[in-house]
Amino acid sequence: MIQKTISETSPPPMFSDEEILTEDEIEEYLDNLKSKLPSFVIILLKNNLRGKRVTKKQLDKIVERITEVLSKGRRDDKTEELNKKLQTLEQKLDAIMKLTTMAVSTKTSEEIEKIKTNEKIEIENAPIKIKSEEKPEKPVEIEVSKKKETMDTGKKTETEEKVKEIEVPKPVEKTHEKVEETKTKGEIKKEVKKEVKLKKYELPKESPMGGSFMTPIEEEKEYRLNDIPEDAVSMTLVFKWLEFLISRGGMTYLPDILDYYNKIGWISNRVILKLLRFAKNMKITFDEEELRPRDKLSPSDHIVSLLYIEKLAGRPIDSEILEMLEIEIRRIKKWAIELQSI
């Protein structure tokens, strides 16, 4: 009886740090840490500690180690930003390499089209020369020979007058006139086109409100890209370029970017109107926060758009420019790796 009373009055035994905890005790211990640790970390600890023998000291060490790792994670945000920048640079390199492959493939098609146009011009010019040389000679010889046979000694005056009329026949004048007209048609058309263009873009000297217009005429400027060709290859390049610009600046800032390129002298107003017309039905979603639209582009983004403009204008892209870009990107990568090692 005494032993029973002692045992009943004695306080319950406290678990020491070296005793192994049960699963219920581990769950209670981890539930108390919800204010210090995130919920997903607590769930992972519960799943990993099931069926394992763990003391309180070991559990304390595990929790301390996790808190240290989480505190270091904030310091490593800068290294993650550098890695993301390197990934964007690699994507730009891939886009530049695709442009070079497209340039090589389109060179052959352009050469074939030039050969076809030259052949058509030669075929069109050939029949004009034959008509101008053959037609005026035949009627003169035939009519003169017939009237020489019918000439009599008593009718010399009449035959001489007829011969004079035959020597300068009307069809000869027409053929010569046709040849001269065909030769001068191209020159006349060129002169008329120049006059029409100047008339279209002439601006009034004074505005209706009394002020003077100081805006320059568009034709006086020389743009890198005056118009967009309508072949399949150039249209695919246009949509790829629009996709790139919208992914960087969005639809809201696209007109501002194109206006900036017009002021620099890269694209004309006609090109801006066509690009805005093509971009009406385009939609691009932004999943990551870093790829959201910006009001201004980086210098590397302007370089990529300049390469698109040069390709659409039909000018080949030098391989030396691409090599210089690759060298600069490698330098940036080395600089980022050195920052990570510090």
From Swiss-Prot:
Gene designation per UniProt: flaD
Family: To M.voltae FlaD, also to FlaE.
PANTHER family the UniProt entry points to: FLAGELLA-RELATED PROTEIN D-RELATED (PTHR40698:SF1), FLAGELLA-RELATED PROTEIN E-RELATED-RELATED (PTHR40698)
Protein name from the UniProt record: Putative flagella-related protein D
Spans traversing the lipid bilayer: none
Keywords associated with the record: Archaeal flagellum
Cellular localisation: Archaeal flagellum
One of the GO biological process terms: archaeal or bacterial-type flagellum-dependent cell motility
Gene Ontology CC annotations of this record: archaeal-type flagellum
Major place of residence: other
InterPro entries hit by this protein: Arch_fla_DE (IPR006752), FlaD_prd_arc (IPR016682), Flagella_assembly_related (IPR052494)
Source organism per UniProt: Methanocaldococcus jannaschii (strain ATCC 43067 / DSM 2661 / JAL-1 / JCM 10045 / NBRC 100440)
